[in-house]
Amino acid sequence: MSWLKKLTAGLKKSSDKVSSSLSGISRLFGKGRIDAASIEEIEEALILADLGVSVASEIAEGLRARNWQGEVTPDVLREALAEQLTDILLPVEKPLTFKQAEGENDLHVILLVGVNGSGKTTTAGKLAARFQAQGRHVVMAAADTFRAAAIEQLSGWGARTETKVISGERGGDAAALAFRAIDEARADKADVLIIDTAGRLQNRAELMEELAKIIRVIKKQIPEAPQDSLIVLDGTVGQNAIAQIDRKSVV
């Protein structure tokens, strides 16, 4: 099976999993009301979607505490679910903050990590666009030296956002590329360096060691860097996201 067919099959599996669970919730809308039984069904559907028992239970409790009046439409229930999820996530939200420029070591390094296909390169481009709009001088580094067209994809985002992209040859040393990127970003007097890394599974020891090497090289030049390590997750992976975060947080 080609990589494209494997990717398509994987995306369809994730989509079907979520759609199947949400369709169970959608069927409740025909009742036009929310009662104890329907909330239990919603909780079960969320658990089947691999949201996690504790989170599903917390959402269900929030729904029970609401004062439901009149007909409950699909949009009303979706909005209520979104509000419950927001309430859970807000306490752990961490905004990106930047120090005031005081010297060359104030280059803010952001390292993007995650499994294949999670959207790291696209996230790099979106972050660059956001920071550029804030008036910051941004440089991106294509440290994904393995994936076909990874450099071209990031270069495309660089062209769209008018951001310099530092790259090397495919199959090259990602840590060496990160080292050179810091040198060039400093020479350009950049405020932010976004390093896009190759996708890697958390259970592959050799790939995690390579990521650790990149971090060691970065710290040799800027001890406090990377100031932010962002893991990019597919929203449909469920509880596997926790395993990804746990393993990468110890690197």
Regions found by a protein language model. Give the residues of each.
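Inter-motif core of Ras-like GTPase G domains
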Residues: 163, 209-235, 247
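Primarily NTPase-proximal linker/entry elements flanking Walker-type ATP/GTP-binding cores
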Residues: 13, 17-143, 149-171, 175-195
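Compositionally biased, charge-rich terminal segments
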Residues: 1-10
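Alpha-helical scaffold elements adjacent to nucleotide-binding pockets in ATP/GTP-utilizing enzyme cores
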Residues: 6, 153-157, 210-213, 244-247
